[in-house]
From Swiss-Prot:
Lyase listed as a keyword: yes
Gene: endA
Organism in which the protein naturally occurs: Thermococcus gammatolerans (strain DSM 15229 / JCM 11827 / EJ3)
Protein name in the entry: tRNA-splicing endonuclease
EC number: 4.6.1.16
InterPro entries documented for this protein: tRNA_endonuc-like_dom_sf, tRNA_intron_Endo_cat-like_sf, tRNA_intron_Endonuc_cat-like, tRNA_intron_Endonuc_N, tRNA_intron_Endonuc_N_sf, tRNA_splic, tRNA_splic_arch_short
Amino acid sequence: MIVFYLSGDRVFSTDQNAINGLYNKRHFGKLVEGKLFLSLLEATYLVERGKIEVREGKRKLTVEELMNLGRERDELFDAKYLVYKDLRDRGYTVKSGLKFGSHFRVYRRGMDEHSQWLVWVLPENSRLSPNDITARVRVAHGVRKNMIMAIVDEDADVTYYKVEWVRF
C-alpha cells in the first residue's frame, strides 16, 4: 500500500511506486521536487478504491475523514467529488481548472494532448447569472476548450451540459 501524508489541504508521498504508478501512468497529482502531491479530491478517490492510504502522523485517515477535511475547506466539495469520481470512473484524466476559472480541466485519455473540456460544478439549486455563464464560456472559447456545466442533483446524480457560443 502506498502511504501519503496529510499536509494542509493536500497529501504527499515520496514513494517511487506512487510517482511511477499514479503520476507517470495514471496522471494523478503534481510532482514537485521529488514529492507527489495529491489534492484532497484525488486522495479521497484513491483511498476509496484502496490504492493508497493517507496518514496524519501515524493515524490512518478514513474516506469519511478525508471528505470532512474537504468539506471544511470547500462548501462544494461533495458535488466536486461526485463529478471528479464520475469522470475518473469513465476513464478521463481530471486536473484542476482553477487557472481557467473552472473547477476542472478534463483530458480524453492520458495527457498527451491539451485538455478538451473545462468543467464547472454546480448543485442543481444554484442560481446562475447570465454574466457568470458568459464569462466562463468566453474563457473556454478563448483557450479552445469546451465549457461543460456539471449539475449535481439531490440524489447525487450528475448531468452534463455543454455550453457554447452560437453564431447566426
